[in-house]
Amino acid sequence: MIPGEYVLSDTPILCNRGREAIEIEVINTGDRPVQIGSHYHFAEVNPLVTFDRVRARGMRLDIPAGTAARLEPGDATTVRLIPFAGGRLIRGFRNEINGAVESCMVSGASEPASGTGETS
């Protein structure tokens, strides 16, 4: 091996394999592009991007880590979303959930079940 040499596998790396995914239609109704990172809580993206936010709660884009999707003004497209894994704690972003995703998942609700979504 040569110092600094890369030895790559012929086998492709499969991202998010086995994760249950959904597809939803989104439209950027704003006049500026919107960029959404791979691990951004999709339900909290720019309010000028219209889509079913209840279905997107607890989900992120099904794209490789560190990448992003860009929606140009007027763009209508379908995105593929997968659930957050691990402890499923959503903190920050637009501060709409700020706690356990499950505490905010109420069937048919358009707002979090309890204020900030904080758990004790």
Curated annotation (Swiss-Prot):
Give GO MF terms, alphabetically.
urease activity
Q: Where does the source fall among the domains of life?
A: Bacteria
Supply the EC number(s).
Answer: 3.5.1.5
Instruction: Name the UniProt key words of this record, in alphabetical order.
Output: Cytoplasm, Hydrolase
Q: Does the keyword 4Fe-4S apply?
A: no
Q: Which GO terms describe its biological process?
A: urea catabolic process
Chief location bin: cytoplasm
Subunit description: Heterotrimer of UreA (gamma), UreB (beta) and UreC (alpha) subunits. Three heterotrimers associate to form the active enzyme.
Compartment(s):
Cytoplasm
Name listed for the protein in its UniProt record:
Urease subunit beta
| Family the UniProt entry places it in | Belongs to the urease beta subunit family.
Coiled-coil intervals, chain numbering: none
Q: What class of enzyme is it?
A: hydrolase
**Which species does this protein come from?**
Corynebacterium efficiens (strain DSM 44549 / YS-314 / AJ 12310 / JCM 11189 / NBRC 100395)
